Every structure is written in C-alpha cells, then in structure tokens.
Swiss-Prot record:
Heme b b562 binds at residues 82, 183. Component of the ubiquinol-cytochrome c reductase complex (complex III or cytochrome b-c1 complex) that is part of the mitochondrial respiratory chain. The b-c1 complex mediates electron transfer from ubiquinol to cytochrome c. Contributes to the generation of a proton gradient across the mitochondrial membrane that is then used for ATP synthesis. CDD domains: cytochrome_b_C, Cytochrome_b_N. Fungal cytochrome b-c1 complex contains 10 subunits; 3 respiratory subunits, 2 core proteins and 5 low-molecular weight proteins. Cytochrome b-c1 complex is a homodimer. Heme 1 (or BL or b562) is low-potential and absorbs at about 562 nm, and heme 2 (or BH or b566) is high-potential and absorbs at about 566 nm. GO terms for cellular component: mitochondrial inner membrane; respiratory chain complex III. Heme b b566 binds at residues 96, 197. Binds 2 heme b groups non-covalently. This is Cytochrome b. The keyword Endoplasmic reticulum does not apply. It comes from Strobilurus tenacellus. Gene3D superfamilies: Cytochrome Bc1 Complex, Chain C (1.20.810.10). The chain crosses the membrane at residues 32-52, 76-98, 113-133, 179-199, 225-245, 289-309, 321-341, 348-368.
C-alpha cells in the first residue's frame, strides 16, 4: 500500500482504481464500464495476434483467415474470440448508453464525459465496419461497396472521396490495405479516448440511481466495487466461452464464408447486427443524401441531449411520463434492429419511417416537452403549497 501511494505512476492508478470514492447505492447497471474495459483489452490483444498471421491482400486475405483457422495453433479460438467479443462490446456499450439515458448521466456536470462517450461510440462503429471488411468474404466486399458508396451523396466532392477511399474505381486490394491499416491503428486511438473518458469521470465521480449528490455516502473502489465488478466479469467470461466453443457463428453472417466475388451480388446486403438500427434509418428515407444525413445524425443527436433535456429532475426513476417514453424508445430501437435486417419493401419501409420519426422525436420533441410540462407542474404545486401554508 505504501508503494501505491509513493510511486508517481502507481499513485495515479491508486487514485483511480483503489481509493476512488464511489456512491454507496450503485447497482449492477454501473458494471458495464468495467466490462467494456475488459472487451477493449481482449480486442487489442486478439487483434494483434491475428494481424501476425493475416495477409491484407485481395487475393490472399480470405485464405489467410482460413490459414488462421486451420493451421495456426489455437488460431480458431483467437479469431472466434475476437469476432464475438466485438459483438459483446456493442451489447455492453448500448446497455451503457441506455443506463446513461435512463438516469440522465449526460446532465451537467458530466457533459464532457457524455460527449467523449458519444465520440467513442462513433469510432467503435467505424472500427467495427473496417473489421467487417477485412476477411474479404462475400458480405465483406458488398458491404464495403454499399456503405462507402454512401459518401457519393455528398455534393460536388462525393464521388472523388469514394474513389480516394477505394484507391481506384471499385473496392479492391488498395481498399483492403487502407481498411486493414486503419483497423489496426484506430483501436489505440479508441484506448486514448477511453482514458480521456475515465479522466472526465474522475472529475465529478459517477452518477447514482437517485440522481442526487452522494458526497456524504461513498465507499472506496477497492474492495467493494472491484469485487462487484468481478461478478459480472466472470459471468461475461462464462457466456463468452459458451458462445466461442459451441456457437461461434451465432452473431456472424454465413455469406462471409464465401470468398469475395464482385460478379455475384448477395440476395441481401446487410452490415453487422450492431449497425442495423442506423442502417434501417438510412433506408427509411428515399433521398440518398437525406438518408446519409439522418444516419449520421441519429448518432450525433446524442450530443444535444444536455441541451434539450430541460427537466430539473435527474433520472427517469421519479418521472412516470418520461419512464414510459424511455421504454417505448427502447422497444422502438429494438424494432429498428429488426427492420435493418429485412428487405426494404412494404410494410418494412413504412414501419421504418415511423420508427425513424419516433427516434428523432424522442430527442428533439418528447424529452424537452416532457421536461417543460414537469417543471410547470412542479412550480404550480410549490405555489399551491405556499398558499396553503
């Protein structure tokens, strides 16, 4: 303990991981941060090992993945772990954001913390998309073609940007090299943002389920919350082991086991499951440019929440109306997952348009309007109490 407090580097670690005071009433919903940290470490480690055996060449990429699976000792475990932890990474980050939305963790003084988190989410999606292309299977090729083509909707410079990304006039060897290089380096940028996120959290500490200051009732991180985190970490490793060993392709796409063929178009071109809600928003708008704007806007709109939430109460646990709208939003978001996996035909297109409308209405209309109504009712109730006194 003396070493932890005297050494310059270890003293910093001690202040963040050992002596850091946490609210006494934190629930298991606050465990997603530690799970995400474990996922990031696993992804970087397994990714580095996979990169040692992968060949970023259009004619050899698919075979090099098969080489990892068949010839490299325990290569199949490393690859399936990397692929499935990526899915868990997004499951945990969606749950982490959902908890932040429910308990209003984006409100002052944690605006910087929330903003860095949104940037992390956008970067994660970019890294996930790049990784989806790297095996250069059939869905990798056509997914890359469709998604990168979206940038052609940008006026004047769109097509030039697409060809710059491709390194030619179609997805080719140059594209694969670009994507592999970015997929390798961006996780380290992500790790730097996670450190910044952690530092921003350390300034004001964690929010808590009651939404009020908890400075008078806090416990140190170790041993109380470290052991609490270990419960969910061990549960995660158990579930991950079951999936890796028994259902490794549960969250993957079977078309990616077919080598990339630019002459054969898959029956349905879809991105990885964790991008489906935003893909559904993109397809629900007929105009290409507006669809791209809506897709990116559906992510960046999270940044405006600290401005649009006008309620004086932190968290939805004491707000019945907002609690109803929040769970309706969750159901709507799950529906967008489903719609993103369907063909853009009737009735999926119309349902997608309704779901997209509600998605944006939640942030721009429902959240501020509900806050104003609650504030007005609160003021009227206070005045009535004053008159009665």
């Amino acid at each position: 303990m003396r070493l932890l407090k005297n050494n310059i580097i270890l003293r910093l670690l001690n202040s963040y991981m050992v002596d850091s005071p946490q609210p006494a009433n934190l629930t298991y919903l606050w465990n997603f941060g530690s799970l995400l940290g474990i996922c990031l470490v696993l992804q970087i480690l397994t990714g580095c090992f996979l990169a040692m055996h992968f060949t970023p060449h259009a004619e050899m990429a698919f075979n090099s993945v098969e080489h990892i699976m068949r010839d490299v000792q325990s290569g199949w475990i490393v690859r399936y772990t990397h692929a499935n932890v990526a899915s868990f990474f997004f499951i945990f980050v969606y749950a982490h954001i959902g908890r932040g939305l429910y308990y209003n963790s984006y409100k002052s003084p944690r605006v910087l913390l929330w903003s860095i988190g949104v940037i992390i989410l956008v970067l994660m999606m970019a890294i996930g998309f790049l990784g989806y292309v790297i095996p250069f299977g059939q869905m990798s090729l056509w997914g890359a073609t469709v998604i990168t083509n979206l940038l052609s909707a940008i006026p004047v410079f769109g097509q030039d940007i697409v060809e710059l990304i491709w390194g030619g006039f179609s997805v080719s060897n140059a594209t694969l090299n670009r994507f592999f290089s970015l997929h390798y380096i961006l996780p380290f940028v992500l790790a730097a943002l996670v450190v910044a996120h952690f530092m921003a959290l350390h300034i004001h500490g964690s929010n808590n389920p009651n939404g009020v200051t908890s400075n008078t009732d806090r416990y140190p991180m170790y041993p109380y919350f470290i052991f609490k985190d270990l419960v969910t970490i061990f549960a995660f490793f158990w579930i991950l082991s079951v999936i890796v060993f028994f259902y490794p392709n549960l969250m993957g796409h079977q078309d990616n086991y077919i080598p990339a063929d630019p002459m054969v178009t898959p029956a349905s071109i879809v991105p990885e499951w964790y991008l489906l809600p935003f893909y559904a928003i993109l397809r629900s708008i007929p105009d290409k440019l507006l669809g791209v704007v809506a897709m990116f806007g559906s992510l960046l709109i999270l940044l405006v929440l600290p401005l649009t939430d006008l309620s004086r109460i932190r968290g939805n646990q004491f707000r019945p109306a907002m609690k109803f709208f929040f769970w309706f939003f969750v159901v709507n978001f799950i529906m967008l997952f489903w719609l993103g996996s369907q063909h853009p035909n009737t009735p999926y297109l119309e349902i997608g348009q309704l779901s997209t409308t509600f998605y944006f209405s939640f942030f721009l209309v429902i959240v501020p309007f509900t806050g104003l109504v609650e504030n007005t009712l609160l003021d009227l109730n206070i005045k009535e109490l004053d008159l009665n006194l």
